[in-house]
A protein has these predicted regions:
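Alpha-helical transmembrane bundle of multi-pass membrane proteins
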Residues: 25, 42-262, 285-494
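Short intracellular "coupling" helices and adjacent cytoplasmic loop segments at the cytosolic face
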Residues: 263-274
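Cytosol/matrix-facing amphipathic helices and coiled-coil assembly/linker segments
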Residues: 273-287
Length: 494
């Protein structure tokens, strides 16, 4: 017990250290900037100084964005942590294949529900309160999953966590986008995706460390330890301000919005505050043609283009096969002849690659733009998936791991970095949560369907056929990006 407890505490102290180092980086940035204003700003990537604002304001913006984005860490952790416990659960409770499927998929169906209903609390109760309740859902799910005594208690607990995941994909990117200035919005909103990938990697490492304890209750620790970061995230959400855009759009509270803007940057002048408030309230002027879509029903012709973009960017995200490849990576590697242990090691390598190239995507998104990253990612998809299909068809198996790693890199710096940012930018204030919910629901329903179909497809079709299909879909994706997607880099929200 002492060994398991030491492993657990050591792992999560490390996680807390990572979070603390990010916050220390923001404060260190302030000290360096004030002491050596002429020095290069090496930490600008994580906490960029927004042109026209003070360093203090930039740090607050980064801290609030990071706090909201930690919902993504829990999202990634919660989604992948089950991989270390599913075999033990099936044997422990003697589950049939159907019951096993219920246990494993319960969280995924929770995300579908969460993405469907996420717009309601986000608009009705506010972004801040919704983020706080997301943390509570994660906390309840983690503790309950670790203490579950059977299939149905376990499935309900995982379903609750899935609801939190689904709502987080609606609220967190939206909240960050509404706080951020146009020329830094991509990088800050992209923190959500970066934390998803970080959560996935930490979950894989956590499972590996806890599994070494050899305890029959190791699976309970794997699931239960999520309570630590969930509790930290929930506590941090208490200090978040409400989105000034929500205060204006849904509460007509210009004074409250003014206070948030003043808290963000105490050094701002009254004249600048008036200008910022005028920009927030401009979208309520129905007499201006550019604002009429804000007051039209969501399912209306004026919103047809952003609705189509939100649906298709989420649809093509899944049609790349990324979730199937992430979930079933060991099985794919075993098809090439790798032993099970080597296949698992390759899977951890996927997590590391995903993290590194997500960071690259965040660095590029406000430099090259969203559409450019989607195009670059599409070319990477087509090349890696096409080569992978060829490698399977010619039995050149040594190429397959490299193709999979290249595919993950293309996804991480392309679609993965862009999807949540783009959806949060293309809708007006009154419909932003609806649009985010549409994109999130589309993402999760196709993820669920693909996860359901992929194991069957692997047994019914040759690998080259499956990868060839994904490659064809990414060719369609590239044509769609060229034809329909408009660049949103640096464009103010409406």
């Amino acid at each position: 017990v002492d060994r398991r407890f030491a492993t657990l505490i050591g792992l999560y102290c490390s996680w807390l250290l990572i979070a603390s180092r990010l916050l220390i980086a923001a404060n260190a940035r302030t000290w360096l900037f004030e002491r050596y204003p002429e020095a290069p700003n090496f930490l600008a990537l994580l906490s960029p100084v927004v042109e026209g604002t003070s360093v203090n304001a930039s740090n607050k913006l980064f801290f609030w964005s990071l706090t909201s984005a930690l919902a993504g860490f829990l999202f990634g952790f919660d989604t992948v942590v089950i991989s270390g416990a599913e075999k033990t659960i099936q044997s422990l409770w003697q589950l049939s294949d159907f019951e096993h499927g219920i246990a494993i998929s319960s969280a995924l169906w929770g995300t579908v529900l969460g993405s469907m209903i996420g717009q309601f609390p986000t608009d009705r109760y506010g972004r801040r309160k919704t983020l706080l309740w997301i943390g509570i859902l994660y906390l309840v799910s983690a503790v309950w999953s670790g203490l579950a005594t059977g299939l149905w208690t376990f499935s309900i607990a995982r379903f609750i966590g899935g609801v939190g995941v689904g709502i987080s994909t609606v609220t967190s990117p939206l909240y960050i986008a509404e706080l951020s200035p146009p020329h830094r919005r991509g990088r800050l909103a992209g923190l959500f995706q970066f934390n998803i990938v970080l959560g996935i990697l930490i979950a894989l490492i956590s499972n590996a460390l806890i599994a070494q304890s050899g305890s029959e209750h190791a699976w309970r620790w794997m699931l239960g330890v999520e309570a630590f970061p969930a509790l930290l995230y929930t506590a941090m959400c208490v200090g978040l301000p409400e989105s000034p855009r929500w205060l204006v759009a849904f509460r007509n509270d210009t004074q409250g919005a003014r206070e948030v803007l003043r808290t963000l940057d105490p050094d701002t002048t009254p004249e600048q505050l008036d200008q910022d408030l005028a920009a927030l309230t401009a979208g309520r002027d129905t007499s201006h043609p550019s604002n009429r879509s804000s007051h039209a029903p969501f399912w209306s012709r004026s919103l047809a283009l952003p609705i189509a973009i939100a649906f298709l960017v989420a649809f093509f995200n899944q049609m790349s096969g990324v979730n199937a490849i992430l979930y079933f990576a060991p099985r794919i590697f075993e098809l090439t002849g790798l032993a099970e242990q080597a296949a698992l090691l390759q899977s951890v390598g996927i997590g590391v690659t995903n993290l590194i190239f997500t960071f690259v995507g965040l660095w590029l998104i406000d430099r090259l733009g969203r559409k450019t990253l989607l195009i670059l990612g599409s070319f990477g998809y087509i090349a890696s998936l096409g080569l992978c299909a060829w490698a399977f068809s010619t039995k050149t198996y040594w190429l397959v791991p490299g193709c999979i790693f290249a595919f993950i890199a293309a996804h991480a710096m392309g679609q993965g970095a862009v999807i949540w940012v783009l959806i949060s930018e293309i809708f007006p204030d009154q419909h932003r949560a609806n649009g985010q919910a549409l994109g999130s629901f589309t993402h999760w329903i196709f993820a669920a369907l693909l996860t359901l179909v992929f194991p069957i497809a692997v047994t019914q079709f040759a690998p080259e056929v499956i990868f060839g299909f994904f490659c064809f879909m990414m060719c369609l994706h590239l044509l769609w990006v060229f034809a329909m997607v408009r660049e949103t880099k640096g464009v103010p929200l409406t």
